[in-house]
Each structure stands twice: as C-alpha cells, then as structure tokens.
C-alpha cells in the first residue's frame, strides 16, 4: 500500500491510495517518531467492532500520525493530532539515567529551526493538516470547538483537533493568537526542548518552571480557548501552571513516575493537581520499551542523523523513515493507578501513533479487567471530550 507522510519539513503532496476497505483515502499525515513503535496488524478489521465500542465516542488524546484507515479500524472518533518542529538530541551526560534528575540548566535538546523560520514552519504544518482534511473531507474534519466535535462524530467522520506539541510562539502572544486563528486548540508549553518561558522534564529543570511571560501565556490560552497540555513539562512548570489555572488542563500522553521511575512521567502529586482543575490525564495506552531503552535509542539515532545530514531539512525527512516498531498491549496497570490517584472522571488514553487498530480491543480489555460500561465510556473518550468542550469552546 502506498503511503504519504507529512511534517513541517516536507511540503504538501497529493496522497492517493486504495485502502483495504476498498475506498480511496489519504493514508497518513504527521510524524513517525522512532520511539512511537507504530505497527499495523491485519487481525483488526471493521467486522469485529463490538456493539458497545460503536456506541462510544473514542478519543486518541495524542497522535503523531493520523492514518484514516487505521483510525477507522480502531473505532476512533476523535484524534488530538500533535505537530511541531522536529527536535534533536544533542547532548547527554555520561551514563545518563532518566530516573536521575538532570543538572539544572542542562540543555540537551534543540529544534531544527529557530526564530521566524520556526514560526513559518509551524504555519506550514497547520496548512498541511488543513489540506489533508480538505482532500479527504468525506472521512475527516478539523474540529475547532466542542460543537464541531459533536457534529463531526455524529456525521460518521473523524474529528481532528490540532495540537502544537511545544510552545514555540516566538515569545509573542500575537503569534499564539495567530496559531489559534489558524486552528490550533491544544498546546504544550514545552515538549523536549525547554522554551524561553517554560521548562521541560527533559532539560533545565529549574524553578520557576514558568517565568512571568509564561504565566501570561497560560492566561492567554484560557482566554482564547487553547487547552494547556502538561504532559512533558517539568515538575516546576506543572506546579506553576496548576497554581494559576482557572480552567481544566490536560496531560495528553504520560505514564506514571511511581511505576516507571522516569522524570518524563508524572508524579502522583501532579496527577491529582490536573484532576483538581477538572482536567484529564491520558495514559499512553500501549506498554513498550523502558524509558532508558528509548533514551539510548534516541541519542544513537540523532547522532547518526546529524553526522549524515548536514541540512536540517534533509535530517528531518530522514527521521521520518527511522521508525522502530514492536507490538504492545493496553497498559491496564497504569490505568488502574491513575484511576486510584485522580479518579475515574479524569482518565483518558492516547496512542502516540502506536498500534491504533488495536483500540478496537480496548473495550473488551477494560470490561474483562473489571470496569463497567459507564467507566469504559469515560476512559475511552468521554472524559477528554468533556475537557475539550469546557476549554476550547
């Protein structure tokens, strides 16, 4: 099957493919991360949709790749599509261990692009997603508010909510407003690289997590209707955001630090804080490699790409073809933990583009595990839809 990939380092092309469902649809848009473990499995087909699964609104709280056919096979109705500038791993301390707090002020990550070019690249990415949705409007549509989500899902199409994966807004509220006008409805202050106004859990790790401008950004997001994502912010950034939040926030993709011992995952204290805002924590649905294994794989990959591709454009394109894949299952133990800590009304799921077709089995997995139908509906999407409706309008 022919596939076409898009990201901010690649201009829009005409994607055409004939799917296994016998319909012509655009196959993919977005990034394939080498830690995303994306796989397809022929076992999952539309004929196996359970009655309950079909009745639910199923939400993928964080996807780096939108594949229409795979979403349909997985029974997913709403996808939060993350995009942004590629970031590269440029420094690691000897024998670095992600369970050990990095030195304060350490810079380990950087985006491929800077300044006005970075903003332009983000605008290109938004345009690519809009073009993709327009080309396949019979199957997918961008949602800009809660009413859009309800309408699109009711029509039988997939609702796509655009998310800026890191707060690269050129230190400008005007740029934030511009991105909102173009359709961005979710934003993480920092992902891998710390921004000038917010620390990430991967580097810096210095109080305060938000500076004065960062606090202005959070307030502006609440005013214009951009849902704030704390998934990979530092503890300090999370605490500072939670201390001023007046609307629900989200963690679009995380595990639990009490289980993984990884600084990239959230502490119970932060999980409770997100719940206290009325927000939702989206558990990375699949199990997979340990954080240390991903950490070392990323470093090796980006060092090789930096050596082989001097041009950032070519390096970003090469990264797309470097996905590592392996099979995974629903991470029930982490879901149980977040339910205990934050409550059933504050738990969701996300794929990070991993094994989307397997979502068709999640309803049965959760019920067999002991959750009732009402609880399954909340976990699979009801909680995320509520938070989106309360924040983006």
Regions found by a protein language model. Give the residues of each.
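Active-site core of metal-dependent hydrolases
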Residues: 188-191, 196-273, 282-286
């Amino acid at each position: 099957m022919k596939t076409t990939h898009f990201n901010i380092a690649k201009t829009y092309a005409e994607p055409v493919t004939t799917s296994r469902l016998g319909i012509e649809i655009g196959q993919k848009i977005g990034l394939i991360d080498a830690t995303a473990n994306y796989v397809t499995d022929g076992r999952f087909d539309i004929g196996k949709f359970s009655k309950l699964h079909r009745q639910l609104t199923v939400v993928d709280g964080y996807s780096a790749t939108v594949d229409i056919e795979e979403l349909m096979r997985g029974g997913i109705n709403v996808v939060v599509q993350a995009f942004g500038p590629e970031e590269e791993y440029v420094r690691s301390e000897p024998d670095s261990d992600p369970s050990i707090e990095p030195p304060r002020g350490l810079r380990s990550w950087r985006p491929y692009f800077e300044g006005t070019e970075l903003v332009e690249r983000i605008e290109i990415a938004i345009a690519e997603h809009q073009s993709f949705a327009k080309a396949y409007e019979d199957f997918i549509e961008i949602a800009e508010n809660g009413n859009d989500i309800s309408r699109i899902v009711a029509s039988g199409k997939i609702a796509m909510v655009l998310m800026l994966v890191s707060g690269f807004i050129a230190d400008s509220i005007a740029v934030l407003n511009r991105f909102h006008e173009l359709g961005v409805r979710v934003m993480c202050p920092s992902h891998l690289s710390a921004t000038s106004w917010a620390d990430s859990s991967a580097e810096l790790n210095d109080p305060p997590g938000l500076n004065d401008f960062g606090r202005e950004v959070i307030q502006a997001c609440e005013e214009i209707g951009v849902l704030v994502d704390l998934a990979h912010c530092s503890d300090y950034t999370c605490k500072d955001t939670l201390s001023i939040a007046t609307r629900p926030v989200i963690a679009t993709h995380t595990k639990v630090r009490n289980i993984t011992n990884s600084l990239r995952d959230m502490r119970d204290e932060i999980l409770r804080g997100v719940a206290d805002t009325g927000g939702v924590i989206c558990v990375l649905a699949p199990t997979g490699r340990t954080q240390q294994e991903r950490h070392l794989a990323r470093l090796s990959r980006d060092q090789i790409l930096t050596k082989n591709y001097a041009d950032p454009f070519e390096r970003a394109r090469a990264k797309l073809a470097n996905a590592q894949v392996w099979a995974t299952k629903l991470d029930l133990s982490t879901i149980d933990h977040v339910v205990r800590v934050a409550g059933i009304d504050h738990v969701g799921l996300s794929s990070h583009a991993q094994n989307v077709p397997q979502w068709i089995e999640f309803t049965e997995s959760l019920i067999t595990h002991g959750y009732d139908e009402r609880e399954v509906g909340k976990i699979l999407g009801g909680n995320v839809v509520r938070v989106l409706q309360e924040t983006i309008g």
